[in-house]
Design a protein with these regions (language model features):
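Gly/Ala-rich beta-loop-alpha elbow adjacent to hydrolase catalytic centers
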Residues: 71-75, 79
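Conserved alpha/beta-hydrolase catalytic His-Asp/Glu region
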Residues: 125-160
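Short beta-strand immediately N-terminal to the catalytic nucleophile in serine-hydrolase-like folds
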Residues: 69-71, 96
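Flexible "cap/lid" loop of the alpha/beta hydrolase fold
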Residues: 82-122
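Conserved serine/cysteine hydrolase catalytic core
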Residues: 147-213
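Conserved HGGG/HGGXW glycine-rich cap/lid loop of the alpha/beta-hydrolase fold
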Residues: 1-45
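Catalytic histidine-centered segment of alpha/beta-hydrolase-like enzymes
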Residues: 211-226
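Active-site loop/oxyanion-hole signature of alpha/beta-hydrolase fold enzymes
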Residues: 32-68
């Protein structure tokens, strides 16, 4: 029996792999799913600093020949960097609203968003719960009602020590020349995220998809997202 295509799912900020990719469980019927928890997220301990470059190096341990890499949000930035480091190990690359806002500087919506995020980090509250509420409102994610769980509060503390993804230098030349299909997905809710995704589409020669209805966390749509990824990965397998 042939082995199943291998999907490596890289989560973003605030919540771990299990919560980020819960709606992708049905994909396990078609694919081998690898979804590691990044450092600083439950059930692991807190960390003092999160840096996307260091995370890209850490992610390499999970790359194997033929991997289909899928990254959401901060995990999308990590995935872009990891793909440029080891393109020979990848069969395809999918990123979902990576906050690499530096690539869209000069676009008013992106510039305004960068300013608001930087203000939140430098001048905002240091209370993890309130910091998280403000962050979720900024990026277009649903804010849970009531008190935050200990797991979410840990995610908030990790969020507070993240290096700004707007500082990421995306290696466009390496990625564009890599002979693998690329897909950029957005949720159609934010002009700032759309600006980033539009630049990535153009500079990487990527396919582009917009799936509205779940804000920043497009994968939480479940079936529509899963069908998109399934079609893209199966096409990549035969290309």
């Amino acid at each position: 029996m042939d082995s199943q295509p291998r999907l490596l799912l890289v989560h973003g900020s605030v919540v771990n792999a299990e919560l980020t990719w819960n709606a992708q469980q049905p994909l396990a019927e078609r694919f081998e799913i690898v979804a590691p928890n990044r450092r600083g997220f439950p059930p692991g301990p807190d960390v003092e600093r999160v840096d996307f470059e260091d995370e890209a190096a850490w992610l390499e341990q999970f790359l194997e020949p033929g991997t289909h890499l899928v990254g959401h949000s901060y995990g999308g930035v990590i995935s872009l960097l990891a793909a440029a480091r080891r393109p020979e190990l990848l069969r395809s690359l999918t990123v979902i609203e990576p906050p690499a806002f530096g690539v869209a500087r000069g676009v008013p919506a992106a510039d305004e968003f960068i300013a608001r995020i930087e203000e939140h980090w430098t001048s905002g509250t240091r209370d993890p719960a309130e910091f998280l509420r403000g962050f979720l409102a900024l990026v277009g994610s649903t804010t849970p009602t009531g008190n935050f769980t200990p797991e979410l509060l840990q995610g908030a503390r990790t969020l507070m020590v993240e290096r700004s993804p707007a500082e990421a230098v995306i290696p466009f030349d390496e990625l564009a020349s890599a002979p693998l299909p690329k897909l950029v997905v957005s949720g159609g809710h934010s002009a700032a995220f759309d600006a980033v995704c539009d630049v990535l589409e153009e500079r990487l020669g990527a396919e582009r998809a917009v799936l509205p209805g779940a804000g920043h966390s497009v994968q939480r749509l479940g079936e529509p997202f899963n069908e998109l990824v399934t079609s893209f990965v199966e096409c990549a397998e035969t290309s």
